[in-house]
């Protein structure tokens, strides 16, 4: 929200909705069974498509205006940033970029959560670089 306020002329409600809902499909993609295996639906569709389905179902019940739904769907579809990272479409709105970069920063910061206390430097496969864990 702070980023949206700093940028200005941003639909903060849409940013919040996108931030809360961009990964909602993971609730159906990943099972709650031991080991958290993927569901059949999850393997076949993936969380992005499943998020769209869930949001469409809710939007129909709430009678969300079509234009508003389209803006939210764009955020969900583009939250990985670009095609190379798995997004079916690339970010095209301020709100989509804000949600994408917030999600990306969150994923990067999570890489600092687990490390070997004996070695402050650790190679991170996801980021393909060494990270310094100073605390």
Where are these regions (language model features)?
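Divalent metal-dependent catalytic cores for phosphoryl transfer on phosphate-bearing substrates
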Residues: 3-115
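N-terminal intrinsically disordered, cationic/polar leader segments
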Residues: 100, 117-118, 122-135
């Amino acid at each position: 929200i702070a980023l949206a306020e700093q940028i200005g002329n941003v639909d903060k409600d849409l940013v919040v909705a996108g931030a809360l809902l961009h990964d909602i499909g993971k609730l159906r993609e990943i099972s709650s069974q031991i080991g958290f295996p993927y569901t059949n639906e999850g393997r076949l569709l993936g969380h992005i498509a499943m998020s769209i389905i869930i949001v469409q179902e809710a939007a129909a019940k709430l009678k969300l205006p079509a234009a508003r739904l389209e803006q939210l769907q764009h955020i969900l579809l583009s939250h990985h940033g670009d095609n190379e990272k798995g997004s079916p479409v690339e970010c095209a709105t301020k709100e989509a970029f804000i949600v994408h970069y917030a999600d990306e920063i969150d994923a990067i910061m999570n890489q600092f959560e687990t490390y070997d206390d004996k070695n402050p430097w650790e190679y991170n496969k996801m980021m393909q670089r060494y990270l310094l864990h100073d605390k």
